[in-house]
Design a protein with these regions (language model features):
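Long, amphipathic alpha-helical surface segments
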Residues: 2-51, 57-75, 87, 104, ...
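Flexible, active-site-adjacent loop/turn segments at secondary-structure boundaries
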Residues: 72, 81, 86, 128, ...
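Substrate-binding/active-site groove segments that recognize
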Residues: 75-98
Length: 210
């Protein structure tokens, strides 16, 4: 069964105590205690195969903070139609610059883009185990630059480091400071630093606020 994070570990215990008719307030206290213990385990850097991991809520929050939540289709710095949390508009979306989407549509786009990024990480990580924060940092990278740009042909050093299990080497390859048109972008520089801290330290906050 794929590892889906805290909820998967909590579910059997909560179900047991629910069947035993434990009072609701006690269940809430129990869930908080267990969640803290589980969080401590995951935060210590326990590693899993990438196929067992999924983007965490902390990463989703970080992505939305970096990308923004824009409900009107606009052109990004390279001129491509974009909407929501950095979703690149595709022909099948049926949207043009100036069109508006709903919050629900934004969430659906984000969900689909995250899945694509997760799959992109699984393709390059293969059998190399990753901690939750390492996986999240790589998902952010793929989400930001696109799955094609992290393949061996485009990012050979990143793939070589992953194949060797060289985590320090992977961290060094997380920086992408140029937009699709080759221009250096300050936002990408800052995001790369955030991504590196996420990978190395499990810190998800914006370093610009420190």
């Amino acid at each position: 069964m794929p590892f889906t994070g805290r909820s998967q570990l909590l579910a059997p215990l909560i179900a047991f105590f629910t069947v035993s008719e434990t009072p609701v307030e006690d269940l809430r206290d129990l869930e908080e205690d267990i969640d803290q213990e589980v969080g401590d385990v995951l935060d210590e850097g326990q590693r899993f195969l990438a196929e067992e991991l999924f983007a965490s809520d902390d990463l989703v929050d970080a992505i939305q903070e970096e990308e923004g939540k824009v409900l009107t289709v606009y052109r990004d710095i390279t001129g491509l139609p974009t909407v929501g949390a950095g979703h690149l508009v595709r022909p099948e979306d049926g949207l043009r610059v100036g069109d508006r989407i709903t919050e629900a549509q934004m969430r659906e786009f984000l969900k689909g883009d995250l899945k694509q990024a997760e799959d992109g990480v699984r393709r390059i990580a293969k059998a190399t185990p990753l901690s939750q924060n390492e996986f999240d940092a790589l998902v952010d990278l793929v989400y930001n630059v696109g799955p094609g740009n992290v393949l061996p042909s485009k990012s050979p050093k990143l793939n070589e480091a992953l194949a060797r299990g060289d985590y320090a080497g992977v961290a060094r390859e997380l920086s992408y400071s140029k937009a699709r048109d080759g221009r250096r972008a300050g936002g990408l520089v800052n995001r790369s630093e955030r991504r590196r801290r996420m990978f190395e330290r499990g810190e998800y906050g914006d370093p610009r606020e420190g």
